[in-house]
C-alpha cells in the first residue's frame, strides 16, 4: 500500500471525533459532529489544495484570491456522505455537487473533466468497492487522479490495502484508520447509521 493517508489531527477534529465515539449520544448530536468533521476535514484538504492567484488592485496593491481557472466538484456517496457534505459546503459554497446513487453511478457530473477540475469525494465510512467504481468513472470522464481527494470518517487498513493496489497515489483524509475490521466495528458503523436516520 503506497496510499497517502492523512489522519487529521486538528484539535476540533479530535474533539468531534471523540463525540462520535460515544454511541450513547443522541442522533442529533452525532449528526452535528459529522457535519463539523466534514467541515474541518475539508479545511485540512483545502489548505494545501486551493489554487490562488495574485491580483493587482488600485495603488499598486496586490492581493491573493482563489483562482477562477479551477472548478471544484464535491462528489457525495449517498446517503451517508451527505452528512459530511453539510459542513464541506460551508468551505466550498461554489462547488458543483454530484451524487453517487445506489448503483454506484455518478449523477450531475460532466462527461468532460480535465486537469483544471478538482474533486472531493465524501463518504462516512470508506467502502473500497464503491470507491473503486467512483474513481474508475471519474477517470473515464477525464479526471486526474492527483486532483481527487477522498474524505471519510473512518476506514479499515484492509480496505486501504485493496485501494492501494490499484490507486497507489490516491490521497485519503480521515479521522481514524482501523487496523482490524471485525464484527464490532461493523456494529459500531451500523449504530451510527441507524441513529442518523432514526
UniProtKB/Swiss-Prot annotation:
Record InterPro entries: PRibTrfase_dom, PRTase-like
Species: Porphyra purpurea (Red seaweed)
Keywords for the protein's UniProt record, in alphabetical order: Chloroplast, Plastid
Compartments, as annotated in UniProt: Plastid, Chloroplast
Superkingdom of this protein's organism: Eukaryota
Protein name, per record: Uracil phosphoribosyltransferase homolog
UniProt cross-references to Pfam families, sorted A to Z: UPRTase
Keyword Thylakoid in annotation: no
GO cellular component: chloroplast
Record-linked Gene3D superfamilies: 3.40.50.2020
Family in the record: Belongs to the UPRTase family.
